[in-house]
């Protein structure tokens, strides 16, 4: 689920972490897991300012993910 913050979108997750490829789908950046995998393997995704090529990278609360000119911040729900 995306929410708007002053500077970037906030994406809420209901678990401690989410894998990078799953996050791209959850945030509606990609239409499928295959598409997510290709963008990640091509070095088109940054996590906390660093290019990330591991699709299974665990993304935790507070991480910032950049893709295609957009930034999102992950927020783990406490509910």
What are these regions (language model features)?
Residues 1-2, 17, 23, 35, ...:
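Generic N-terminal leader/processing signal
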Residues 4-18:
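A detector for short, charged/polar N-terminal pre-domain segments
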Residues 1-3, 78-79:
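Short acidic DE-rich linear segments
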Residues 54-79:
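C-terminal structural segments of small proteins and small subunits
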Residues 19-61:
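A basic, amphipathic helix-loop patch mediating RNA/tRNA/ribosome contacts
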């Amino acid at each position: 689920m995306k929410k708007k913050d002053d500077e970037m979108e906030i994406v809420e997750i209901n678990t401690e972490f989410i894998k990078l490829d799953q996050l791209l789908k959850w945030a509606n950046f990609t239409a499928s897991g295959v598409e997510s995998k290709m963008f990640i393997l091509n070095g088109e995704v940054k996590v906390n300012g660093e290019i990330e090529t591991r699709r299974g990278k665990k993304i935790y609360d507070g991480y910032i993910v950049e893709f295609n000119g957009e930034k999102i911040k992950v927020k783990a729900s406490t509910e």
